[in-house]
Amino acid sequence: GGNSVGWFWKAGDTDGKTYTVKVHDFSGNNRYIFDDFQTQAVTLDLAEGGTYIFNMDDATNATHPFSIGTAANGTVYTSGITYFLDGVSKTYSQYTSGFAAATTRRLHITVPASAPQLYYWCSAHSGMGGAINTNSTLGSSNFAGSIQSTAKVNASAGFSIVTFTGTGSNATVGHGLGVTPQAFILKGRNFE
């Protein structure tokens, strides 16, 4: 074998993030988008133990109750999930029936250990969502750049670990720190 160098660190203890959810028309097909990232059916990465908030206050969501389940268009998943309309905790049935009339809409999920493959979808219309990876995830989906990345962030320490797949052309990658970093190290994972 050859010589190897490794860096090992932990960027944060518990993942968590708030995603702003909107519905976008892609050539006549409504799809969910996150944080204004203009790509449909993205696969979300949510770390086990992390708490994530999905904010559906935008008017484009009014008739599209955002749901999480174990199948692409159904089978509601409830472990670790709390639904809120206008700041009040609701059952899933109350959430979907009162969704359109609410001013503020939130879905909170604390991803349990060994959570199954999950999906996000609209409870009223099929084909609007995508997959959620939970097992062995090393961070949370980040839509701050021109390409999607996964970031493990400790903003108070000023440190993040970001993974992404390049496109072969110029792109920007979000780091999740909220301020411009002073330095960064980039290592290609497929180089010998």
What are these regions (language model features)?
Residues 22-48:
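N-terminal edge beta-strand
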Residues 1-16, 137-192:
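Surface-exposed molecular-recognition determinants
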Residues 43-49, 114, 174-180:
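Extracellular/lumenal carbohydrate-interaction signature centered on repeated Trp-anchored short motifs
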Residues 11-15, 25-29, 57-62, 70-75, ...:
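Acidic glycine-/aspartate-rich tracts in secreted/extracellular proteins
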Residues 21, 60-63, 85-138:
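Extracellular/periplasmic metallocenter environments
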Residues 47-49, 104, 167-171:
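Solvent-exposed, conformationally flexible loop/turn segments
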Residues 62-88:
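N-terminal V-set
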Residues 6-10, 45, 51-55, 108-110, ...:
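Residues within well-ordered beta-strands of beta-sheet-rich folds
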